[in-house]
Swiss-Prot record:
PROSITE patterns: RIBOSOMAL_S14 (PS00527). This is Small ribosomal subunit protein uS14. One of its GO terms (biological process) is translation. Belongs to the universal ribosomal protein uS14 family. InterPro entries: Ribosomal_uS14, Ribosomal_uS14_bac/plastid, Ribosomal_uS14_CS. Binds 16S rRNA, required for the assembly of 30S particles and may also be responsible for determining the conformation of the 16S rRNA at the A site. Part of the 30S ribosomal subunit. Contacts proteins S3 and S10. It comes from the Bacteria. One of its GO terms (cellular component) is small ribosomal subunit. Pfam families: Ribosomal_S14 (PF00253).
Length: 101
């Protein structure tokens, strides 16, 4: 199990990403715009750098909903591979069963 503080940190990051997503997108559009002046582009870079570090989407980490485990995360289920296997063996996931060939 992951520490509660790690889970809380990820939730905080998710809120920051949602809060600043539009602002980051507009600043990145200005930076990549070829027709914008150099001064406007430079000001956009400075404003982007002044935003909170955790507001970047790449800082987020997918975590298992039950355990908070950061590795082996399966997006389709929102669980780690270990919890998916346990649920599968108990028959809690419809249509999913152990492979055999």
């Amino acid at each position: 199990m992951a520490k509660q503080s790690m889970k809380a940190r990820e939730e905080k990051r998710a809120k920051l990403v949602a809060q600043f997503a539009e602002k980051r997108a507009t600043l990145k559009a200005i930076i990549s715009d070829v027709n914008a002046s150099e001064e406007d582009r430079w000001n956009a870079v400075l404003k982007l750098q002044s935003l909170p570090r955790d507001s970047s989407r790449s800082r987020q980490r997918n975590r298992c909903n039950q355990t908070g485990r950061p590795h082996g995360f399966l997006r389709k289920f929102g669980l780690s591979r270990i919890k998916v296997r346990e649920a599968c063996m108990k028959g809690e996931i419809p249509g999913l069963r152990k492979a055999s060939w």
